[in-house]
Amino acid sequence: MLYSPLLSFVRLILLIIWVPISSTSQFFFHFVLRKDFFFFYKMFFRGLTYIFGIKVNIEGAPQKQNALFVCNHISYLDILILGSNLNGIFVAKSEISEWPIINKLCKLGRTIFVDRNNFFKVKDQVKLISDRLDKGLSVILFPEGTSSDGSKVLPFKSSLMGIIESKKEKNYKVQPVSISYSKLDGMPVELKFRPFFAWF
């Protein structure tokens, strides 16, 4: 992720061009022509990782369908990395559904919005996730309920993890995913440099 004012400007221009073109293409090919959803979904995120200069190294093989991906959360960049490599639908906090532009992209990506602070909605929100899994789709969940600098995994706060206990008979697959930002500009990342990309 090399930085310079000129490179930042170029990336901004590419971002402005890429987002409307790719999102419009995704809408047209999937919702109009009924083509494969995740092909264009992942293409959108891969374009973003390329624009931002993010190189991803993957260890292990992700499940293809009907899986609950349980992941640590460090940065908004996590979304790009996971979205470009997993056939999964994100679970996001309900506030994001009110963010201009971002909310439209999330809805296009079938994001499941949840209110983590409303205990009375937990049952309905668990059903939303289980319905997706029952259809053979996979879901990406950040059970820590917040982000960190990535030095450790925070205690799980998400009551949505109860879906595993309550739906034992469904035999859902659970795959843990760990994200680590190991290099910045090609150099190993020390703890003091993590605020460059971590949101906590």
Per-region residue spans from a language model:
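Catalytic core of membrane glycerolipid acyltransferases/transacylases, capturing the structured
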Residues: 19-34, 38, 49-51, 67-120
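Short amphipathic alpha-helix with an adjacent loop that forms part of the alpha/beta core around
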Residues: 60-63, 128-133
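Generic beta-sheet signal
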Residues: 65-71, 88, 137-141, 172
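A cross-family acyltransferase "interaction/gating" segment
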Residues: 103, 151-200
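Alpha-helical bilayer-embedded segments of polytopic membrane proteins, i.e.
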Residues: 7-22
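A short, well-structured juxtamembrane/interface segment
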Residues: 43-67
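Soluble extracytoplasmic domains of inner/organellar membrane proteins
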Residues: 122, 129-130, 137-141, 145-156
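Short, Lys/Arg-rich, polar N-terminal cytosolic tail immediately upstream
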Residues: 1-3
